[in-house]
Regions:
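Short, flexible hinge/linker loops that cap or flank conserved catalytic cores
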Residues: 64-65, 194, 258
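N-terminal short leaders/motifs
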Residues: 8, 136-150, 238-252
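An acidic, phosphate/nucleotide-engaging active-site surface
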Residues: 162-214
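Short, flexible coil/linker elements and helix-boundary hinge sites characteristic
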Residues: 6, 21, 45, 148-149, ...
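Short, flexible loop/turn elements at secondary-structure junctions
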Residues: 75-81, 193, 204-207, 268
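Core catalytic region of metal-dependent phosphoesterases/phosphodiesterases
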Residues: 52-183
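Acidic, histidine-bearing metal-coordination/catalytic regions of metal-dependent phosphoesterases
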Residues: 1-73, 78, 184, 188
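Conserved beta-sheet core of the metallophosphoesterase superfamily
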Residues: 106, 197-201, 206-272
């Protein structure tokens, strides 16, 4: 009887979530966030083992003696969706491509990637098929890739739909075709700019919160996975937000207390 009660409760919860627009695939994706700690376990062979390092001092990118660079993340574009603002996306890409010392990191959901398991009308609300969405993404990003403007790319919950169904990540295809770093579920990057070094952690995001505080809480949770980063980047929630805080540490050589500022950036969306 107890097992039947639990089963009925689970069915009721799934029904409510479906009515709220949360698909079963989205629920599975949220579990991926819960598994981030397991993914980073030392015994996990698939855990990230090395950060992607970029020098902006004339070694890899940019010209020597640069004091700063600009990073404009791209994500939640949903190419293929009937309400995707493709022209605005093209304008962003043009700016990144033509502006000196400006780069991007692709944080997922670049395509709509609707399947028969998607919530609502799903595939009936897209303008063209998944293979066309992938090809269009490749062609739109190609000019940036040729100029080494894309520092990494990862999947989002929309790409996760085909990953779960057929073990195919559209963003891995894009990365391989364009020769850009594939970050997987979580991205670690090191930027050397002038005499400074910045550590960055990226994740598409998995929050369904409708409040600013809830969304900030979701990106702050990334500190439990990636410690002592300078910048945390996240998308998914379709609302732009920014926050910062200060963390203190001890210099092991001098014993002095070191203050370090951490930045939290949540990007928006290009759905009309």
């Amino acid at each position: 009887m107890a097992d039947q009660t639990v089963l009925n409760l689970e069915d009721a919860v799934k029904k409510v979530l479906t009515e709220m627009g949360v698909s079963q695939t989205d629920l599975l994706y949220k579990k991926e966030l819960d598994k981030l700690q397991d993914i980073h376990d030392l015994e996990n062979e698939k855990r990230p083992k090395k950060a992607h390092r970029f020098s902006f001092n004339g070694v890899d990118l940019a010209e020597p003696n640069k004091e700063y660079i600009s990073i404009i993340p791209i994500h939640d574009i949903h190419l293929g969706a009937i309400n995707a603002n493709k022209e605005k996306f093209k304008a962003y890409l043009k700016y990144i491509c033509e502006t000196e010392d400006t780069y991007t990191i692709a944080l997922g959901d670049l395509i709509e990637n609707a399947t028969k398991c998607s919530v609502g009308l799903g595939i009936f609300e897209t303008e063209y098929h998944i293979d066309e969405q992938i090809e269009e993404t490749i062609e739109l990003l190609r000019p940036l890739a040729e100029k080494k403007k894309i520092l990494g790319i990862m999947p989002g919950n929309h790409e996760y739909r085909t990953m779960k169904l057929v073990s195919m990540d559209p963003m891995k295809i894009v990365a391989d075709r364009l020769g850009i770093p594939y970050l997987g579920w979580s991205g670690y990057l090191i930027f050397e700019v002038g005499d400074q070094m910045y550590k960055v952690f990226c994740f598409h995001g998995a929050s369904s919160s409708s409040t600013p505080a809830g969304r900030l809480n979701s990106i702050r949770k990334l500190r439990d996975v990636a410690h002592n980063m300078d910048l945390y980047l996240m998308g998914h929630v379709h609302r732009r937000q920014y926050d910062k805080d200060m963390v203190y540490d001890i210099d092991e050589k001098t014993g002095e207390i070191i203050a370090k500022k951490r930045h939290y950036v949540i990007g928006g969306s290009l759905l009309s």
